[in-house]
Amino acid sequence: MNSAVEQQLAELGIEAYLKEHQYKSLLRFLTCGSVDDGKSTLIGRLLHDSKQIYADQLDAVHADSQRVGTTGERPDLALLVDGLQAEREQGITIDVAYRYFSTQKRKFIIADTPGHEQYTRNMATGASTCNVAVILIDARKGVLDQTRRHSYIANLLGIRHFVVAVNKMDLVEYSQSRFEEIKEEYLAFSKKLNNPNLDISILPLSALEGDNVVNPSDALSWYQGEPLLEVLENVDIDADKGNGEFRFPVQYVNRPNLDFRGFAGTVSSGGISVGDEIVALPSGKKSKVARIVTFDGDLTSAQAGQAVTLTLEDEIDISRGDLLVKSQSNLQATDQFKAEIVWMTEKGLEPGRQYDIKIAGKKTVGQIDAIHHQVNINSLEKFDTQELPLNGIGLCDVSLTETVSLDRYQDCADTGGFIFIDRLTNVTVGAGMIQNLSDLSESKPINDNISAFEIELNALIRKHFPHWETKDISKLLG
């Protein structure tokens, strides 16, 4: 057992500790930045200095530090996070590593994301569920291309709180002038993100030495702000949750017996109360909320982020993938929209090819009609392209085979975000964030002359029998 938990148990007792722990707010944050900026070391330092490491974990780190560590005689705290063998041997982060810890104020889930450009898709995956981005900058190198790249992606994915940590201050002799120079450079860049709602905190620290991570440092006496952990403890994310209209994607129809039929899911945005009138989409049928059921008992209301089961006063047809909204909602139904797309596979995104598209709990079929531009996310410049490559980000027109109720991503991430799934391999090949919705009168459906079966058969033949020189049917009839 780690010492922080032991101390709290001794003070409160097991039941009081568990009750207090249950109702703490949860903050999800990711660490990102350029290669070797010290992301994994920072997380290791956070865990170590907040007394969240078990004795056997610390012993293992000491042993591994002698073999593959990069910090000399001291334990390499980055090894607490870099779990893959390839990561330890190369001294880099490849996959997204998740760690959990808590303080007396808050619970945390950390996503340690890779800094290398070829793992940008991993970083986007880690950022998609986070409230805060901790962006590390090496005090010696300043703002680099990958710093801009990760800031752009975090902003694109709806993260509204940035904590910019200028790391390795010990290597620039804790220079205040160097810190101010980097701070000015980053704030100038952040204006190009065109997001007036961004909350940016910038602070100096040394993850290796532990300066200003959990505790204030005499070496940084000129810095009058809070250490990193206090900043994270005090970030206000409750205001973000309460915004927006009620959205409830149905994940599961719960029918344990003939007397109960409920619809389980997580409230994506807004709130709902017993007695509120709702509309089930796409059917458009109305009813009122009879009960809000949880494992701990019924609630009178539920807010964004809560997993609940709703029962209705009327028996109406609702299934997995349907969406519940309030009756006065102005949610738009469409089969065409513009979206920023992050491409995640070696084979580039090609307009005209069909993919399975999953939005919240709903699965449908769609295609890219056109690529407006790709973004150079190092300079934020836009340029024309015929296809999106691996790790490419661009604005595209997307068409669906059916009408779906959607939001813009900035209004609701769950009903405004989606993934592309390759129909042959079932591999997730891309992720999208809806920017603009088209009116149904303006929308153009996918070519009705081609069935989904014909598209898949044609793709299989072209993949496995290339010597037949079969043409792409979707392009021939598009």
From Swiss-Prot:
- Which InterPro entries does the protein's record reference? CysN_GTP-bd, CysN_II, CysN_NoDQ_III, G_TR_CS, GTP-eEF1A_C, P-loop_NTPase, SO4_adenylTrfase_lsu, T_Tr_GTP-bd_dom
Q: Which reaction does it catalyse?
A: sulfate + ATP + H(+) = adenosine 5'-phosphosulfate + diphosphate
One MF annotation (Gene Ontology) recorded for this entry:
sulfate adenylyltransferase (ATP) activity
Q: Where is this region: G2?
A: 91-95
What Pfam families would the database entry show?
GTP-eEF1A_C, GTP_EFTU
Kindly list the positions annotated as binding GTP.
33-40, 112-116, 167-170
Give the region (G1) as residue ranges. Answer: 33-40
**Which Gene Ontology terms describe the biological processes this protein takes part in?**
hydrogen sulfide biosynthetic process; sulfate assimilation
Q: What EC identifiers does the entry list? A: 2.7.7.4
Q: Which CDD domains match?
A: CysN_ATPS, CysN_NodQ_II, CysN_NoDQ_III
Q: Relate the protein's function as given in its record.
A: With CysD forms the ATP sulfurylase (ATPS) that catalyzes the adenylation of sulfate producing adenosine 5'-phosphosulfate (APS) and diphosphate, the first enzymatic step in sulfur assimilation pathway. APS synthesis involves the formation of a high-energy phosphoric-sulfuric acid anhydride bond driven by GTP hydrolysis by CysN coupled to ATP hydrolysis by CysD.
UniProt subunit comment: Heterodimer composed of CysD, the smaller subunit, and CysN.
Question: What's this protein's name?
Answer: Sulfate adenylyltransferase subunit 1
Organism listed in the record: Aliivibrio fischeri (strain ATCC 700601 / ES114)
- By which gene is this protein encoded? cysN
